[in-house]
């Protein structure tokens, strides 16, 4: 599951990036990670508090690496596949699963994916943010099940 370089970021996220000294998606403390989850997801991701703390501590310990990766990705033109004719070459059936309330990568990305991927279909989950598999696991699983059933015949 990957956005393949198609990243029409929401005005909200671009504003947060502009107003922040660092990327809000890269936590520098366990509490930052909790804030990131709250911001990126519309529903609870169902992770217990102790696990969020542990994950946040690990992510904070790797913040410098994550910042470097973020910079490299944003500076590398090879990461921008939209409009380069790469995605239309993918003939495999593709499910585009998106949360309507995604505050990071807006739902308008779905239209771009459908244009670029000729053999795709989209499922947009209402009331779901950036992490549909964690926010709506049953709905996500059902979308995948129906997709796989349809392509298997």
What is each of the regions a protein language model found here?
Residues 9-14, 51, 108-109, 135-137:
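Short aromatic-enriched loop/helix-cap "lid" or pocket-rim segments at secondary-structure transitions
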Residues 119-153:
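Catalytic active-site module of serine/aspartate enzymes centered on a nucleophile-bearing elbow/loop
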Residues 7, 103-104, 131-135:
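A short, basic/aromatic alpha-helical/loop segment that forms part
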Residues 1-29:
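Flexible "cap/lid" loop of the alpha/beta hydrolase fold
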Residues 83, 92, 106-115:
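Short alpha-helix in the alpha/beta-hydrolase fold that links the catalytic acid
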Residues 32-35, 56-85, 89:
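Hydrophobic, aromatic-rich cap/lid helix
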Residues 77, 101-105:
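Acidic catalytic loop of the alpha/beta-hydrolase fold
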């Amino acid at each position: 599951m990957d956005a393949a370089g198609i990243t029409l970021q929401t005005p909200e996220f671009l504003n947060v990036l502009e107003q922040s000294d660092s990327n809000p998606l890269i936590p520098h403390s366990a509490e930052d990670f909790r804030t990131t989850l709250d911001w990126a997801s519309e529903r609870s991701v169902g992770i217990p508090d102790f696990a969020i703390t542990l994950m946040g501590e690990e992510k904070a310990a790797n913040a410098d690496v994550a910042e470097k990766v973020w910079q490299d990705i944003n500076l590398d033109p090879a990461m921008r596949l939209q409009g380069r004719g790469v995605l239309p070459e993918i003939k495999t059936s593709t499910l585009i699963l998106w949360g309507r309330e995604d505050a990071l990568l807006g739902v308008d990305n779905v239209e771009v994916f459908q244009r670029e991927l000729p053999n795709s279909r989209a499922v947009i989950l209402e009331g779901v943010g950036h992490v549909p598999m964690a926010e709506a696991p049953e709905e996500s699983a059902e979308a995948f099940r129906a997709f796989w059933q349809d392509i298997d015949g």
